[in-house]
Amino acid sequence: MLKYIIPTMMLMPLTWLSKNSMIWINTTLHSLLISLTSLLLLNQFGDNSLNFSLTFFSDSLSTPLLILTMWLLPLMLMASQHHLSKENLARKKLFISMLILLQLFLIMTFTATELIFFYIMFEATLVPTLIIITRWGNQTERLNAGLYFLFYTLAGSLPLLVALIYIQNTMGSLNFLILQYWVQPMPNSWSNTFMWLACMMAFMVKMPLYGLHLWLPKAHVEAPIAGSMVLAAILLKLGGYGMMRITLLLNPITDFMAYPFIMLSLWGMIMTSSICLRQTDLKSLIAYSSVSHMALVIVAILIQTPWSYMGATALMIAHGLTSSMLFCLANSNYERVHSRTMILARGLQTLLPLMAAWWLLASLTNLALPPSINLIGELFVVMSTFSWSNITIILMGLNMVITALYSLYMLITTQRGKHTHHINNILPSFTRENALMSLHMLPLLLLSLNPKIILGPLY
């Protein structure tokens, strides 16, 4: 595992020692090399997990998320160049250092064997993200957004720490690899019910569950482009990853505790999709669509069948790449039009025809067009939910229709129609931006050829 952690750490001195002209090229290329070497992790054999040491392990659930984490750093650096062009050198270097630190924490979160270590790293990701949002966001509301983000996440996570200490005292270990073989079921008692809530709430806030999702649109809208990308692509997946890991301990309580949360998620999925149809703010629309997609993942994880787990893992990876790409596209519009309001940025197809092609591709993957992995994930979730309860097909079908509606609404509003006069003299799309979009699209298209590598531990 150190062959990914140490090169990531060495990005720090590389950043601070690079010349002014080379700072972006050096860090982007080095991080791209790290992300390409991380593909070696896909070669897993034996008992389907790689035990690197007592501290780090990786199995077929954490590997896709790990590779996604490393793949995203060069993309974030590419996306942030224009945003930081007016900053002085020290601030650029500080920004890049924050992104590197965040990647380091995320790698350790996804490979931790010990639950307490996982918890510490899970909380540590909060710090760089908060600094990125509150220091480099666009409007002054970013401070409010940072406050929301901090308090929602902390309030959700503190009961988890208490629950983990309790588990440590009763079971004598917090090692994932040992807890897999823990066979003593939890009896139904009030204390165990509260423990279930404490364990799950931290991850439900992070996902976020409908009702606890208010920090997400705020944080997304106010964050700079790199902050939005890493939030949508990876930090939301931490919740799903944690839920899938910790449900091992919580059976059979999950069987009856899951009902209200599944209902809430199914309802929230429809509600947030409908909210998307009423949005005027482009980034806000993409943020709410994230909530709706993650509600599907919550439902899938709580049903706890092999198919739903496969669907949840596939959907997490697919959504990570798709929403990150949509945020990049929204940012490229924002850098030219200087407004996130969709009505002011309409008719861009005539001015930026290649960007319109990327918009079309991103919207189609967002609405889960076959043969994308978004569709594979959604189908698995829909089928497993249908076998759990037939009536859910109404909500699932409705959600798919509304998702298609708001994706096309977003595409048509931004790309079609007559463009407003104040955007006659905008810049054409840069090669950097097109490379950024193609690096988002490439994994999505390649994974649709071979989706089994991201179907998680139960494939």
UniProtKB/Swiss-Prot annotation:
Keywords: Electron transport, Membrane, Mitochondrion, Mitochondrion inner membrane, NAD, Respiratory chain, Translocase, Transmembrane, Transmembrane helix, Transport, Ubiquinone. Its EC number is 7.1.1.2. GO terms for biological process: electron transport coupled proton transport; mitochondrial electron transport, NADH to ubiquinone; mitochondrial respiratory chain complex I assembly. It is found in: Mitochondrion inner membrane. Its main location: mitochondrion. It comes from the Eukaryota. It is an enzyme of class 7 (translocase). It is a multi-pass membrane protein. It holds the Pfam family Oxidored_q5_N. Belongs to the complex I subunit 4 family. Core subunit of respiratory chain NADH dehydrogenase (Complex I) which is composed of 45 different subunits. This is NADH-ubiquinone oxidoreductase chain 4. It comes from Ovis aries (Sheep). The lineage of its organism: Eukaryota, Metazoa, Chordata, Craniata, Vertebrata.
